[in-house]
Amino acid sequence: MRYTFRHIALAGAMLLALALPDAAAAADCFADYKAKKDNPLKLHYGVVQLRQDCSKDSARSEIAKRIRRDGWTLLNVLSVFDASQLSGKESSAGHFYLRY
């Protein structure tokens, strides 16, 4: 069978369309977490937007990597959620709301 450019372009467009919902879902995924610094001990609660998978396991490594650059150690990921559950978390997270 002879494939034309139109067939190849159509197949590529279909694959792209199938991949877009996952990218959109990841962009609308958030997590809240607790972190600490030592000497002196400091604790914080924060909210981040996740760039990768919307799961606690993925969030753990992603958040730990982001906050490490400022000397923070991740204690735990409390939850993973979508934008509809962001309401009210800004006041609790304060300075650490979407900081990382």
Model-derived segments and spans:
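Terminus-proximal functional modules
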Residues: 2-100
